[in-house]
Every structure is written in structure tokens, then in C-alpha cells.
């Protein structure tokens, strides 16, 4: 029987499946951070249980770390306690930890791939909704809750029901300057923010194959934003070349044997999907969200939509509410919307290619008066690579702030946040009310688009910036 990639991955990891019961899956990698793990470790301690597979468990600090200092006290008492607990728990249970002073420290979904912890064919979980990022490697990766974190720590397994399958094919080639972020925003603009609910999505088509691994990570990172359980891209030579030589990747003959297996991780000819969505890459332009869910997205050259133009009464009401919160009027050109802050970072867009794209726009220009612009590398290695290439100097000379690695302004859990009423061009992944700070107004864009907003003071089409 022909199988989809998702079905192959799922079936290969079933430990036990009784009739009329939820299957038990084996988990190959468990990624841990400071926010969703303390209670899980407390649960182990209370029952006298060890971590079953510490060698398959990797921890880092990211969510509430300061991006201005490595001082553990910088972001308040709750952050300090969570980080201290992670240090204590990892030491007690034998889990490898990349703490604030470790050269590999960074956002968990940046750290995993760059260290070769993430490999094709694996099941990967983390107490974080954007674990879908790792699906870019042809791995089944999804976020879990704290009680599930404890279960995986204790058993290296997890009960999971089978999801429905969705194929999203982006046909043809994207135009120059169109990034994975634009592609995925255009996809969600078509499906809506709940279009993938109950599904695992496989992204395919020429435009997807053309993406680098970093682009594919951006794509899969945001599968959750259309309601999907996970996102997948089948592994290919791009994947194998990225993985080869990384710290935790197989070496020598083991790598060759692994690649031979990884090449089987493709959807079979004749396999069927529950849902199929198709887009034409050439029709995708630079995207900007205007509302408070990711389905509320338009081309940078469009006008803010009129709620009256929505036939669906629920969509109309949602648009009215979003415009009121965002402080926008229908009909005004998006390029006339001024911004207060710019955030380039997050598990969506903080890798070296993202920083290069932003630096290309920033080079020789200055951040507009009254705009605060932050560049937050996703990890220690990304920061070091950017500095080796001189990107930090480009940003600093242009008036951007060059920060330490962390989740930063993606979410209001540290010192980097919006004040009420402030408008931000952000490369992160969520734009709901208060995500970046109470009363903050978030517009999601690609790194180059964020840099363009920083230097012009408003949204601007990067294709017009010479």
C-alpha cells in the first residue's frame, strides 16, 4: 500500500498499538528549555524516576534569557528561577545543557539542527509549539505539554493519535527576493489560520525544493500557524549536505548508510492525502500581516482591506476587531503604515541566511529616526558566523542593536517587548494581541522586509530598494 511520508514516519515509530487505543510512539530526540520543563523534572523526582535516555535529551536556555547580558538575574525573578532549575535538573539527571555561557546556547529550534541533533526520519518533541521546525529534515516533530514532557523524560515514548494528511504544493519558481517567509505567509493567507487543523502537512513542489535548509525550517516552523500538528519536507541532497559533518550527525560509513535509508523517506507514488492545496510561486509577492491572526495577510503593495469586503460574517467581525486593535483604517496603502520597532530574530528567522538578507538591505543605510531596531542571532554559532562575516558591523553602523542569542521580542517573556500601541515589523511567527507585549501591534515579515521597514520607517517593497 502506498504511503505518505508522514505515514512512513509514524508507522516506523509505533512501539505498541492495541485495538481501539491510541498508539504509543518511540521518541528519538527530546529538546528541553527552561520554561516548560521544571514541573516535568519535579514529577520525575517525586516518583524516584530517572531520565530514561539522557543521551537523546538536549537542553538549552532561550525563552526568557536577556539578549543584552549573560547575567541570569537580568530578566527578573521568575526567569532566574526557571534557569537555575534547568541547571540543577540537567546536572542531577545527566542531561546535556547549553547554558548562557556555552558557545552552542541559543533558541532550541536553531540549536538542534545546527548541532546535528535533528536528523531525517526521527521523531522529535519539545515543550514548545514551534517544534514543527525540525520537520524541514523529514522528521516528525511536534510540540508537547509539560505533562507529556515528563512522560517522554521517563519513558522515551508518547501516546499519539494519527493525524489527517495534507499536501501543500507550491508550483513553479518564486521570483527573486521572495523568501520562505513570504511563501508560508501566502500559504496561510490561502488556507486561513485554522486550515491545517488536525493535519500533518507535507510541503512540496519546485519552489519548496529550491529552498535551502534554513528556508525549509522557516516554512515548517510556521505550519503550526495554520493549525497543523506538524510540517514536513522530504529529505534530499540539500538535506544530506546540510547534515553532513555536524556534531551529532553520523560519520563515515554510518553516514552513508543513514543517507541510503533517508532516501526512502519520500511519499510513495499513488499515496493519497486527505487535503491538497496548490499555489503558484510566481504569484507570490512580499507578504505582510495586517491583523491579529496569520490568515490576515496581504502583499506589501496592497491596501488595508475593508471588513465589509468579507462575505463571511465571522471573518468580517474578526477583521473589524483586528483593525481596531491594530489602529489601522481600511483602504490605506500598507506602504504608508509607519512603524516604531523592528525585530529580526526568533526560531523562524534568526539563522545566518536571514541575517545576511537583512544586512544586504541595511548596508550603507541608517535606521529611520524614531525607530528602534533589534537584530538577535538565533544561537552562539550564528552570532559568531555573522561576526566573522562582518554583518554585526553593518547592522551597528546602520543603527541596529546587535544582541545576544535568545527568543527575545518574539514573545513577552523577557525584557525585549513592545509598549502599548507600538507597531513592530517582526520576523517572528505570531501576531495575536499582546504576543510581543501588552497592547503591542505586530506585523510579520521576512528579514529583508523588516530591514527595509527599519531604514524607511514604514513598510516598503524590497524590490524597489536599490
UniProtKB/Swiss-Prot annotation:
Pathway: Amino-acid biosynthesis; L-leucine biosynthesis; L-leucine from 3-methyl-2-oxobutanoate: step 2/4. Transmembrane segments: none annotated. Heterodimer of LeuC and LeuD. Binds 1 [4Fe-4S] cluster per subunit. Catalyzes the isomerization between 2-isopropylmalate and 3-isopropylmalate, via the formation of 2-isopropylmaleate. The keyword Acetylation does not apply. Keywords: 4Fe-4S, Amino-acid biosynthesis, Branched-chain amino acid biosynthesis, Iron, Iron-sulfur, Leucine biosynthesis, Lyase, Metal-binding. Pfam families: Aconitase. CDD domains: IPMI (cd01583). It comes from the Bacteria. GO terms for biological process: L-leucine biosynthetic process. This is 3-isopropylmalate dehydratase large subunit. Its EC number is 4.2.1.33. InterPro entries: 3-IsopropMal_deHydase_lsu, Acnase/IPM_dHydase_lsu_aba_1/3, Acoase/IPM_deHydtase_lsu_aba, Aconitase_4Fe-4S_BS, Aconitase_4Fe-4S_dom, IPM_dehydratase_rel_enz, IPMI_cat. Belongs to the aconitase/IPM isomerase family. LeuC type 1 subfamily. Its cofactor is [4Fe-4S] cluster. The keyword Amino-acid biosynthesis applies. One of its GO terms (molecular function) is 3-isopropylmalate dehydratase activity. It catalyses: (2R,3S)-3-isopropylmalate = (2S)-2-isopropylmalate.
Amino acid at each position: 500500500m502506498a504511503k505518505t511520508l508522514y505515514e512512513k514516519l509514524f508507522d516506523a515509530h509505533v512501539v505498541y498499538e492495541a485495538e481501539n487505543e491510541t498508539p504509543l510512539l518511540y521518541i528519538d530526540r527530546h529538546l528541553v528549555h527552561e520554561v516548560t520543563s521544571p514541573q516535568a523534572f519535579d514529577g520525575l523526582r517525586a516518583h524516584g524516576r530517572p531520565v530514561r535516555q539522557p543521551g537523546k535529551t538536549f537542553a538549552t536556555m532561550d525563552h526568557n534569557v536577556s539578549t543584552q547580558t549573560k547575567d541570569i538575574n537580568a530578566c527578573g525573578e521568575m526567569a532566574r528561577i526557571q534557569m537555575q532549575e534547568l541547571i540543577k535538573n540537567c546536572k542531577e539527571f545527566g542531561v546535556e545543557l547549553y547554558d548562557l555561557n556555552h558557545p552552542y546556547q541559543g533558541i532550541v529550534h536553531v540549536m538542534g539542527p545546527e548541532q546535528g541533533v535533528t536528523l531525517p526520519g526521527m521523531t522529535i518533541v519539545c515543550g514548545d509549539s514551534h517544534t514543527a521546525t525540525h520537520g524541514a529534515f523529514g522528521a516528525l516533530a511536534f510540540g508537547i505539554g509539560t505533562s507529556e514532557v515528563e512522560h517522554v523524560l521517563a519513558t522515551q515514548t508518547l501516546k499519539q493519535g494519527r493525524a489527517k494528511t495534507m499536501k501543500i504544493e507550491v508550483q513553479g519558481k518564486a521570483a527573486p527576493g521572495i523568501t520562505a517567509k513570504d511563501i508560508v505567509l501566502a500559504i496561510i493567507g490561502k488556507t486561513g489560520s485554522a486550515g491545517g487543523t488536525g493535519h500533518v502537512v507535507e510541503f512540496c513542489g519546485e519552489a519548496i525544493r529550491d529552498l535551502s535548509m534554513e528556508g525549509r525550517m522557516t516554512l515548517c516552523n510556521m505550519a503550526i500557524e495554520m493549525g497543523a500538528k506538524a510540517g514536513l519536507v522530504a529529505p534530499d541532497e540539500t538535506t544530506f549536505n546540510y547534515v553532513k559533518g555536524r556534531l551529532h550527525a553520523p560519520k563515515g560509513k554510518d553516514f552513508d548508510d543513514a543517507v541510503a535509508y533517508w532516501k526512502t523517506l519520500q511519499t510513495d507514488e499513488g499515496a493519497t492525502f486527505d487535503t491538497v492545496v496548490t499555489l503558484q510561486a510566481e504569484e507570490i509577492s512580499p507578504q505582510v500581516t495586517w491583523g491579529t491572526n496569520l490568515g490576515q495577510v496581504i502583499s506589501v503593495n496592497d491596501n488595508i482591506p475593508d471588513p465589509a469586503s468579507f462575505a463571511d460574517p465571522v471573518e468580517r467581525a474578526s477583521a473589524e476587531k483586528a483593525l481596531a486593535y491594530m489602529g489601522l483604517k481600511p483602504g490605506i496603502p500598507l506602504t504608508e503604515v509607519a512603524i516604531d520597532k523592528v525585530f529580526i530574530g526568533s526560531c523562524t528567522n534568526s539563522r545566518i541566511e536571514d541575517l545576511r538578507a537583512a544586512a544586504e538591505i541595511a548596508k550603507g543605510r541608517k535606521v529611520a529616526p524614531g525607530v528602534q531596531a533589534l537584530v538577535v542571532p538565533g544561537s552562539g554559532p550564528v552570532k559568531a558566523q555573522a561576526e566573522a562575516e562582518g554583518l554585526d558591523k553593518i547592522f551597528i553602523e546602520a543603527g541596529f542593536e546587535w544582541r545576544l542569542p535568545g527568543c527575545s521580542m518574539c514573545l513577552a517573556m523577557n525584557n525585549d517587548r513592545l509598549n502599548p500601541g507600538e507597531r513592530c515589523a517582526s520576523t517572528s511567527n505570531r501576531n495575536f494581541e499582546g504576543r510581543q507585549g501588552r497592547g503591542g501591534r505586530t506585523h510579520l515579515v521576512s528579514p529583508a522586509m523588516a530591514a527595509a521597514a527599519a531604514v524607511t520607517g514604514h513598510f516598503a517593497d524590497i524590490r524597489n530598494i536599490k
